[in-house]
Amino acid sequence: MKELFLIIGAPGSGKTTDASLIAQADATNITHYSTGDLLRAQVASGSELGKTIDSFISKGNLVPLDVVVNTIVCALKAAPTKTIIIDGYPRSVEQMMEFDKVLSEQNEICLKGVIEVRVSEEVAKKRVLGRNRGADDNEEVFYNRMKVYTEPLNEILDFYQKKKLHFIIDGERTIEPIVADMKELIKKIQSI
């Protein structure tokens, strides 16, 4: 059975970088998918689906539920390793509930943990505006993305806390201790 870890955090929390470094360090055992990268790859392809996705991403809004779930399920099925890390998901209560439903209807993938990379809004804003990754990294879009992230957050955290799947990593440190702590946490969870 494949073991899935979801990494959540505010825009600029470092969740994608953290997950990517963990997977790169253990590529034979861990596959990393970023929801954002999966969606941006569709946009870059120029497909009709990509154009639909772009109309949401460019404004900092959520992509429709069915598109996101289908994108993720395809990625999970294609994963070449036992351990899979997906960052940036879920971003809404609806995504969480639909994904939980999809996972409960199959026996190939087990959600082992939801790791929150926690940072303050101030740190997140400084990081996002400093990285200049694309058109979706400006102040107006940042505040919209923060709102989109924080509005459902308590309900998402409550849901996973009740399932004893929620874990927190302090994301305000330098990258090395964050990645080391996350690696250690994943190993600990896998051994339970």
From Swiss-Prot:
InterPro entries: Adenylat/UMP-CMP_kin, Adenylat_kinase_CS, P-loop_NTPase. GO terms for molecular function: adenylate kinase activity; ATP binding. Its EC number is 2.7.4.3. Pathway: Purine metabolism; AMP biosynthesis via salvage pathway; AMP from ADP: step 1/1. This is Adenylate kinase. PROSITE patterns: ADENYLATE_KINASE. Consists of three domains, a large central CORE domain and two small peripheral domains, NMPbind and LID, which undergo movements during catalysis. The LID domain closes over the site of phosphoryl transfer upon ATP binding. Assembling and dissambling the active center during each catalytic cycle provides an effective means to prevent ATP hydrolysis. It comes from Campylobacter jejuni subsp. doylei (strain ATCC BAA-1458 / RM4099 / 269.97). It is found in: Cytoplasm.
